[in-house]
Amino acid sequence: MRYSITSRFHGALLGATIAEKITNPSKSKSTAIAKLLIPGAQSLVELGRFERQSWLKKLLILELTPLQAVVATLPLALFYHDNKINLRSNLLSVASIWQYEPVIQASILAIGYAIAQALTEKLYPTTLIPQIVSFIDAPNTELTDALQQVQTLLEQKAGIEKNIIAKGSITTSVALAFYYFLSTVEDINLSVKRSIQSPFTSSEIVGALSGAYNSAANIPSSWQIVADSQISPKAEMLQLSEDLVAVWSGVYDSKAQLLSTAVAAPRVIRSR
């Protein structure tokens, strides 16, 4: 593997959290996005699987905005990244709350699928969006139309905001997040900084996508310093991401405090 699965889990969660802090440096240390990510991750670790009622109770998801709901499903995408059937089923279980708002359901599926492809090292910028449209399996939704526009603009190396901002708010946020991520896919620093300059997208989603793809190893050291000094739940999120990997791989011991876990692919034994 290009990067360890643990580093990619770290990258996704830290990327989202640090992007939020860079976007809103005046916010308190206890970041809003951490409050979205930690409860769902804790539920998965405690139960060893996704249970809808536990998830909804911990997150109070009906009180979330559509974009917050998309971000809150990131732990699910991490946990079920290697099984697309379970991934889709569990994401839809959460998304079904908005059964009359297909763009929210499509957004949850789109981000979840992209995270999964990054973690399995099957994310290719030129083919990701067509694969997402197929995974959503609901043609002619507002989001799939916008994503297809993004695909065309990426192929043409064209600017994007003037072509996308006429759409609804969550459609705009998700479509632009994919544009900023895919147009500079190997550079988390540039992807996030470009997204911050746009009032129409979510830099947190860009940070999660790029963090999963590039791993924590490629998060700039200056950002890590910001995280160490200004984000109070960083250590908790890192521990939770390690626990998520351990539960996913079947080596988690709920009676032991895991300080550092070496994890290989399932059914493969490797030294630390």
Task: Describe the residue ranges of each PLM region.
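Structured, active/binding-site neighborhoods that engage oxygen-rich ligands
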Residues: M1-R272
